[in-house]
C-alpha cells in the first residue's frame, strides 16, 4: 500500500513523451473569476481576477504531473517574479481514506503551495486534458490567452514565452490609472 501511494505521489511531482497540443476550440476563454482551494498544507489558496500579474496556471493529474517541471523550470528562469506561477492538482480520483496520506506526501515533495482539487470541479471547469501537463497563460483579467498540454519541448516553451512576452509588453504599454 505504501508503495502504491509513494508511486502515485512521486508521479504527481516530476517528463513523459507527447507532443504539446494547442487549445481545443470548445474550451473556455476565461478562467472562473475566483478559484479557492486548499493546498497540501491545508492552507486556503485563492486565485482571483482581476489580478495584477500575468498568471501561468499549471494543471495536472498523477500522470500529467511528470511533465510540469519541463514547463515551469525554463519559465521561472526567464520571467522570475514578473509572472505568477500557480499549480493545480487533480486529485479527484484519490479515495477519501487515502487523502491524508496524499496530502502528507505532497508536503514532503513540494515546498511551494499546490491547490488540491479533490472534487475535480475546478479542473473540469478549466477543461484540462487528463494524463498531460496543462499550461494556461492568463492575463490580469483572467482571460486564457494561451493553452498548451503535453510534454514541453524547446519550440513549445519558446511559443509559450512569446505569448507571455506579448502580454507583458502590452501591459507595459498601457498607462497606469492614477
What is the predicted role of each segment?
Residues 5-15:
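Bacterial N-terminal signal peptides
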Residues 14-33:
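N-proximal helix/coil linker or "cap" segments that precede and/or mark the start of modular domains
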Residues 35-54:
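A short beta-strand-turn-helix
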Residues 53-56, 63-107:
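Structural microenvironment flanking redox-active thiols in thiol-disulfide oxidoreductases
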Residues 84-88, 102-132:
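Short, internal strand/loop/helix patches
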Residues 131-178:
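Thiol-/selenol-based redox modules, centered on thioredoxin-like
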Amino acid at each position: 500500500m505504501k508503495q502504491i501511494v509513494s508511486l502515485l505521489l512521486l508521479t504527481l511531482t516530476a517528463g513523459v513523451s507527447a507532443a504539446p497540443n494547442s487549445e481545443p476550440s470548445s474550451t473556455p476563454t476565461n478562467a472562473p473569476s475566483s478559484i479557492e482551494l486548499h493546498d497540501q498544507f491545508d492552507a486556503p489558496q485563492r486565485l482571483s481576477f482581476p489580478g495584477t500579474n500575468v498568471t501561468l496556471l499549471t494543471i495536472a493529474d498523477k500522470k500529467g504531473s511528470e511533465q510540469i517541471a519541463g514547463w515551469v523550470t525554463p519559465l521561472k528562469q526567464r520571467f522570475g517574479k514578473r509572472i505568477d506561477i500557480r499549480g493545480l492538482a487533480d486529485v479527484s480520483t484519490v479515495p477519501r481514506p487515502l487523502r491524508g496520506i496524499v496530502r502528507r506526501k505532497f508536503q514532503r515533495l513540494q515546498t511551494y503551495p499546490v491547490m488540491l482539487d479533490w472534487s475535480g470541479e475546478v479542473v473540469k471547469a478549466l477543461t484540462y486534458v487528463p494524463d498531460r501537463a496543462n499550461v494556461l497563460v492568463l492575463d490580469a483579467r483572467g482571460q486564457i490567452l494561451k493553452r498548451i498540454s503535453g510534454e514541453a519541448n524547446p519550440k513549445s516553451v519558446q511559443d509559450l514565452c512569446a505569448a507571455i512576452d506579448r502580454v507583458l509588453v502590452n501591459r507595459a504599454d498601457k498607462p497606469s490609472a492614477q
